[in-house]
């Protein structure tokens, strides 16, 4: 223990310098890298999970590159690409790539090309072709749905009958009600109007006929009720003339009294009666109650 303390206390002395030289021991760690390098090659073989002999045979021949080129198009259409994609992540995780990056200066690049070819060999494994067969099952599974689809058609055939059964009744029920009220109303109105017009005309004609009949009766009665009062006065006078002769003078006065009811009677009938009773016509004033006429006769 004392020796390490003394060494730490006197670091500047020459003895420590030779002790410093031993630190190249770190070179010993350099040896581990080769050991680490060696494991990568061991890790490379594991990626070949197939363990089948054919895979290594395919990568061995040089014409393998053209073969992998052709499979990609075949692998693209089917859903197999997702399956091949999963292997690359498994191959990528290995720490082999990062370790080779450090050793390149120590190790010769040739091993890297040897490591490079395996990836392409791993990409086009025969697993895709094996994955292709599975797609056929889906087509077989798809056909069943079409077989199940045909059954639905029967329901449409069942649905139409109710529609046809329901549609006819409404039209038959709806039309009758509207026409019946309209026809009844129109017929009732026409009948009442026609009957009313006929009765009105009949009553009007009856009223006119009764009015005319009553008027004629009144006119006849008034004509019968006419009263004539006639008074005639005759006077005679004798007068002496200038030569001593005597002359007789006769004067006749007629007084006729007619009632005012004559205004309502027919004057023509009344005048005809006067012509029949009297040879001479007289002027009659309907407005005056009486009239007088004078006739003078001279006898020599």
UniProtKB/Swiss-Prot annotation:
Predominant location category: membrane
Residue ranges that the UniProt entry lists as topological domain Cytoplasmic: 209-300
Tissue specificity field: Accumulates in cells differentiating into tracheary element (TE) which undergo secondary cell wall (SCW) formation.
Biased segments, Pro residues type: 12-181
TM annotation in the entry: 188-208
Effect recorded for residue 102 to S: In allele TED7-2/TED7B
Glycosylation sites: 183
Alphabetical UniProt keywords: Cell membrane, Cell wall, Cell wall biogenesis/degradation, Developmental protein, Glycoprotein, Membrane, Secreted, Transmembrane, Transmembrane helix
The name this protein goes by in its record: Protein TRACHEARY ELEMENT DIFFERENTIATION-RELATED 7A
Organism of derivation: Zinnia elegans (Garden zinnia)
């Amino acid at each position: 223990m004392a020796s390490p303390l003394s060494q730490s206390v006197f670091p500047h002395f020459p003895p420590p310098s030779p002790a410093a030289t031993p630190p190249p021991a770190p070179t010993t760690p350099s040896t581990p890298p080769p050991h680490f390098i060696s494991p990568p090659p061991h890790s490379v073989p594991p990626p070949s999970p197939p363990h089948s002999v054919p895979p290594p045979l395919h990568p061995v021949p040089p014409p393998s590159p053209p073969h992998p080129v052709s499979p990609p198009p075949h692998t693209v259409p089917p859903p197999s690409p997702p399956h091949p994609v999963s292997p690359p992540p498994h191959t990528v995780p290995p720490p082999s790539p990062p370790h080779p990056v450090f050793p390149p200066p120590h190790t010769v690049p040739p091993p890297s090309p040897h490591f490079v070819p395996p990836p392409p060999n791993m990409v086009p494994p025969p697993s895709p072709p094996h994955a292709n067969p599975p797609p056929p099952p889906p087509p077989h599974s798809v056909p069943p749905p079409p077989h199940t689809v045909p059954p639905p058609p029967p329901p449409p055939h069942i649905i139409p009958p109710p529609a046809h059964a329901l549609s006819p009744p409404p039209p038959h029920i709806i039309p009758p009600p509207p026409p019946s009220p309209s026809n009844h109303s129109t017929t009732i109105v026409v009948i009442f109007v026609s009957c009313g017009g006929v009765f009105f005309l009949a009553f009007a004609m009856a009223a006119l006929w009764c009015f005319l009949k009553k008027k004629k009766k009144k006119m006849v009665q008034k004509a019968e009720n006419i009263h004539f009062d006639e008074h005639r006065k005759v006077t005679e006078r004798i007068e002496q003339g200038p030569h001593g002769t005597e002359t007789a003078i006769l004067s006749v006065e007629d007084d006729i009294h007619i009632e005012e009811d004559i205004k309502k009677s027919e004057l023509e009938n009344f005048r005809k009666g006067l012509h029949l009773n009297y040879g001479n016509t007289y002027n009659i004033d309907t407005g005056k109650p009486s009239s007088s006429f004078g006739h003078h006769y001279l006898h020599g």
